Amino acid sequence: MIIERWEVKLSKCNQNVGGYSVLSGNLKENIKLGRRAQKYLKELRNLQLKPLKIGGYENCGTINGEEYFLEVIHITSGRQKIDVAVGKTWNVTNIENDNKEELQYELFKEKLKVGKQDMLFFSWMKSLSVQLNAPLHQKMTEHGLADDNTRLEWFNIPLLRRSQYRKKVPYPSLRQMSSVLEVQCSTLTEEKLNFCVGFSDKPLSEWKPQIFEQTYNRYRLQRISPEKSFKYKSRCSKYNFKTSSQSWVVKVPEHDQQLNTFEKRYDELFDAQFNKLEFFKIRMKKLKKNKPIEKKNYKIWCLEKEDLKDLVWDPLKRICNHSRYAIFEHVTINREAYSIKPLRLTFQKLDSGSLDLIDNQKKTFGSIKLAMSMPDVKKTENQSIEESERHDETAIETQEFDENDCLSSKADINTSLAPQKRSFIDNELMSMLVTKKKIKKDKDVSDTGISSTSYLINSGTYANSHIEIPTSNSVYNGKEDCSFNNYSVKHSILEEDIENKCIAVNENKVIENQKVIQSLCKNSHLDLIEQSYFGECDFIINHSTCVYKIQASRFMQLRNNGSLHYDKAVNDLLTEFQRVIIIVEFSEIIQDVDPDLFWKIKLYLLNSRVDVFFIHETTDFFIDWMKYFIARWAFSYNDEKEKNIANADILLDLGFNILLVRKIFQTYSLEEFFMAIIKEESKAVKMLTVSQMTRLKKLLTLEW
């Protein structure tokens, strides 16, 4: 790679100008003067002096005006903003030439430092008018100057013109509106009492003189002469009496007046005809601000635009005026070549026999070493032969029993025969065991009668009437009575129906359902996943079905906001699942005390997406129902398709359950699923609820 560099030779600085060779205008900078210097500058205002020589004063010598360059500034206040314009510059004339030819040279203005000699010069100029016969500020004619040996001409000291003051625009004076409230508050209420005497009905013993003593000083009483009526005017009477109704004024004290005004304001507040604008007409006292601290504001010299243009330093201005050929003659361009060395990327060595894992919750890392073992072919063949023979024997034996005993016999035989084990029971012994179990079961039913659960379920209070026939490989016959007695459910589900099925359990309720989880995973290869789900469900059967266990005793309880105890939890589950299975646990006491509670619960939960089941408060019944739900609605997921799951955390953060995420990634990748939602394909839309669709569409409409 080649880079071209442009080298510019620096021009030599002019020492006479102090290095400012490019500047062609005047340089003006700030000068700080004391009070005396400012006083002398005021007196030298409008003066023009030339190099002069005064006879009789040898000590003074000659004074050359070229050594001094003065400018007078009008003193202004710090808060006043003015624009100062520079007048004509002063011209120094030659003494020898009478033609008054002006000296032509460049004038450069720099800082002026006033020292002791300058102060002596200013004091001498002050006393100069006394030594001369004429004052300096008077204009002298050429004839007077010719007669005198000393020719006095004036230095032209430029003045900074002061611009006009900026007038402050006064604020608009608005008239204050007359306020009724203000007038009432400013005036005191006065009352007049006629000359009359009143007596109280109370006895003298109840009269308290303390009240009169406390209020005596607040009133000013005047003596009133009694009214007299004369029928005739006596001649000897010295006074003439005029009859008139007399009264005295009683002023209400201040505190009473305030109470009176507040009572009036209270009446006006609740008066519909009172205008609200009266409250805005009341005058408010202005707050007195503290005086600001006076700061020393330094005076700034303001220059005109023409003078500022001369001060602009543009070194390339002259170069642009020249041609390219003239520029490249004096300018050299150097070429430099360099190369970039690429960095070597180093990667960590990965072992082929290990798998690195990251725990998102605990924020820990770990690795697993993988190894593969070859199975023994002979053992697998023998096991498959034994299992096939065992299934054939059980199938032949079960065909000999009656159809009524088919359900119980097959369940008992299959549960007793554990996998990978032999049975040493003969056919005769097996038939004897079956008959004994049948007799024992009939006795138990005849003694106890119909159970409470079966009575409620048979009477129609157990759930919504729509019940599907299971399509699994269980021994349950769909043509039989669908009363769903607890005992019939217990014997209708086999362990084989739960094999390789996958469900999810809510991590927040693992401790509560610990016994149920242990019994489900004890004798079956059930794939159970824990998920910290935000809902109140206990188990998730598939991507659209969940199980929620509630207590019948708490159903009618009310919360602080007036809703039922389980109202919010059921509504939240309906927004996330297409089917919600609610298992209501009840006790025998509730059945006897409040039998109407069951149809109330059923009536409240009457919904096409809700299935309700009533069971006793025992874990065994709940386990049997869970086996039935797993065998009926749970699915088995393929591990090979699950390897394609990537970025599953995106859907989990949206509130999707883990089984729904698995269902989505079985048919789509993440990008394909988003495209299917945008196109609103029916297959993808059926998986989600309305709430899940809205959340997903909000995610797809985000912009970065």
From Swiss-Prot:
Q: Where in the cell is it found?
A: Nucleus; Chromosome
A Gene Ontology biological process in which this protein takes part is: regulation of synaptonemal complex assembly
What is the protein's major site of localization?
A: nucleus
Induction line: During meiosis.
| This protein's record includes keyword Nucleotide-binding | yes
Q: Which domain of life is it from?
A: Eukaryota
One GO CC term on file: synaptonemal complex
Going by the UniProt record, its keywords in alphabetical order are:
Cell cycle, Chromosomal rearrangement, Chromosome, Chromosome partition, DNA-binding, Meiosis, Nucleotide-binding, Nucleus
Q: What are this entry's molecular-function GO terms?
A: DNA secondary structure binding; nucleotide binding
Q: Looking at the keywords, is DNA-binding present?
A: yes
Subunit details: Interacts with ZIP3.
What is the recorded function of this protein according to its Swiss-Prot or TrEMBL entry? Required for initiation of meiotic chromosome synapsis. Involved in synaptonemal complex formation, a structure that tethers a pair of homologous chromosomes along their lengths and plays a central role in recombination and homolog segregation during meiosis. Required for the normal localization of MSH4 to chromosomes.
Similarity section: Belongs to the ZIP2 family.
Q: What is this protein called?
A: Protein ZIP2
Organism name: Saccharomyces cerevisiae (strain ATCC 204508 / S288c)
Biological classification of the source: Eukaryota, Fungi, Dikarya, Ascomycota, Saccharomycotina
